[in-house]
């Protein structure tokens, strides 16, 4: 899958990421440069289950959900590589995150993730989310790759009480 046929639609994204509705937050991938950068689209609709709404305020996409969308775009870039197809990606941390503006139903968010550092099992990505020409969120994310294997997930307690 070194050369992807763009744009990647929802079905193609489902072949790369393990996420499914309602938590698959990327609608389309429009640009892809392996190990360098990727651009994805998230169209925010009024039907999103997770829209936050305070009395008197317009509904908006929670910043945590926007952060997850950015992480998913970055994960697509990493997991699309043939050698990573059977692996899982774990985001270990986010740093220097800034939320600049709320995202509302009707907005189309363009998410760009670029590689800051990439090693065989770890890396750092920089993500920027925009609505039109305005940056709505940005930050860096550290991730690790792990093999799918015994079915254990981080934090699972095994017999004997060990994680």
Where do the PLM segments sit?
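Hydrophobic core residues within well-ordered beta-strands of beta-rich domains
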Residues: 23-25, 109, 123
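HotDog/MaoC-like acyl-thioester-processing domains
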Residues: 2-5, 18, 34, 103-105, ...
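Compact, glycine-rich, soluble single-domain proteins
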Residues: 52-78, 91-92
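Hydrophobic beta-strand-centered segment that forms part of the acyl-chain substrate-binding groove
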Residues: 2-7, 74-112, 136-144
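Conserved positions in beta-strands of structured domains
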Residues: 27-30, 95, 100, 112-116, ...
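Short aromatic-glycine motifs in intrinsically disordered, low-complexity regions
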Residues: 8-20
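Catalytic strand-loop segment that frames the active site of acyl-thioester-processing enzymes
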Residues: 21-61
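Beta-strand-rich interaction surfaces with strong enrichment in secreted/lumenal proteins
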Residues: 14, 57, 99-101
């Amino acid at each position: 899958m070194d050369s992807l046929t763009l744009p990647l639609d929802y079905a193609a994204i489902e072949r790369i990421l393990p996420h499914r509705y309602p938590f698959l937050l990327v609608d389309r991938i429009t640009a892809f440069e392996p190990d360098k950068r990727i651009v994805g689209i998230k169209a925010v609709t009024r039907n999103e289950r997770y829209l936050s709404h305070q009395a008197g305020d317009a509904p908006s996409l929670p910043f945590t959900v926007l952060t997850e969308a950015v992480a998913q775009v970055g994960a697509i870039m990493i997991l699309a590589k043939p050698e990573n197809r059977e692996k899982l990606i774990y985001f270990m941390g986010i740093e220097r995150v800034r939320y600049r503006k709320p995202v509302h139903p009707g907005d189309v968010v363009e998410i760009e993730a670029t590689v800051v550092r990439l090693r065989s099992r770890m890396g750092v990505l920089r993500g920027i989310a925009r609505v039109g020409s305005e940056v709505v969120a940005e930050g860096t994310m550290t991730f690790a790759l792990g093999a799918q294997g015994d079915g254990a997930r981080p934090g699972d307690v095994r017999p004997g009480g060990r994680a």
